[in-house]
């Protein structure tokens, strides 16, 4: 049996969680809705997972999914939501555009607040090390376009996303690092793309 991609792992974890929760698998449409893809896209993921020996599907039956092998993420909490890991946040594109998404990861439902969208962003650099955010960490972000002073946010400046502490001043926005090597960024053109609510670290 071959290894699954990150997205295939997330799909398999979702199927496993639904079966445990209600006793039967999700439909292809439900899988598509969960991951923001078409029914055909969901079906293609199922067939790829089936080829790797993790499940069986039956033709012409929307719920005919049988698990053969447990998901590699089975040790994670069952009540979990898959969120996209955004490779880049670019101006002019929806943040969840397919071309922005590099993989998916599960997060506990306790992190979620109702239906507020979330995404993850890979941290680059050491500008936030004094608050325990290191290079390579995965920041869990609640999508929003407003922030309060002192919150850690993802801000888009031109075509570059940065994770910084937000302060709104009279005629500008100040974005502060938490590393004395870096000076504050002062700008009138920053766009808030979300607020930090959690952190994943891979050892």
Curated annotation (Swiss-Prot):
InterPro entries: LexA (IPR006200), LexA-like (IPR039418), LexA/Signal_pep-like_sf (IPR036286), LexA_DNA-bd_dom (IPR006199), LexA_repressor (IPR050077), Peptidase_S24_LexA (IPR006197), Peptidase_S24_S26A/B/C (IPR015927), WH-like_DNA-bd_sf (IPR036388). The active site is at residues 127, 164. The record marks 91-92 as: Cleavage. Its EC number is 3.4.21.88. It comes from the Bacteria. The keyword Repressor applies. Keywords: Autocatalytic cleavage, DNA damage, DNA repair, DNA replication, DNA-binding, Hydrolase, Repressor, SOS response, Transcription, Transcription regulation. One of its GO terms (cellular component) is protein-DNA complex. GO terms for molecular function: DNA-binding transcription repressor activity; sequence-specific DNA binding; serine-type endopeptidase activity. It catalyses: Hydrolysis of Ala-|-Gly bond in repressor LexA. Residues 28-47 bind DNA. The keyword Acyltransferase does not apply. GO terms for biological process: DNA repair; DNA replication; negative regulation of DNA-templated transcription; proteolysis; SOS response. Homodimer. Represses a number of genes involved in the response to DNA damage (SOS response), including recA and lexA. In the presence of single-stranded DNA, RecA interacts with LexA causing an autocatalytic cleavage which disrupts the DNA-binding part of LexA, leading to derepression of the SOS regulon and eventually DNA repair. HAMAP family: LexA (MF_00015). Belongs to the peptidase S24 family. This is LexA repressor. It comes from Leptospira interrogans serogroup Icterohaemorrhagiae serovar Lai (strain 56601). The gene is lexA.
């Amino acid at each position: 049996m071959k290894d699954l991609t990150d997205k295939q792992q997330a799909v398999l974890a979702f199927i496993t969680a639904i079966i445990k929760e209600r006793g039967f698998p999700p439909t292809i449409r439900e899988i598509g809705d969960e991951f923001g893809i078409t029914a055909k896209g969901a079906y293609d993921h199922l067939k790829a997972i089936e080829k790797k020996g993790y499940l069986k599907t039956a033709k012409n039956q929307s719920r005919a999914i049988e698990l053969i092998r447990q998901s590699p993420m089975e040790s994670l909490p069952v009540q979990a939501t898959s969120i996209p890991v955004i490779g880049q946040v670019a101006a002019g594109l929806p943040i969840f555009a397919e071309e922005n998404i590099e993989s998916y990861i599960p997060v506990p439902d306790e992190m979620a607040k109702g239906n507020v969208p979330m995404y993850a962003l890979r941290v680059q650099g050491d500008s936030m090390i004094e608050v325990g955010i290191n290079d390579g960490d995965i920041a869990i972000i609640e999508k929003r376009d407003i922030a309060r002073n002192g919150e850690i946010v993802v801000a888009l400046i031109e075509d570059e996303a940065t994770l910084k502490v937000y302060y709104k001043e009279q005629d500008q926005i100040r974005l502060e690092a938490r590393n004395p090597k870096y000076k504050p960024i002062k700008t009138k053109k920053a766009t808030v793309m979300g607020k930090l609510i959690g952190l994943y670290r891979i050892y």
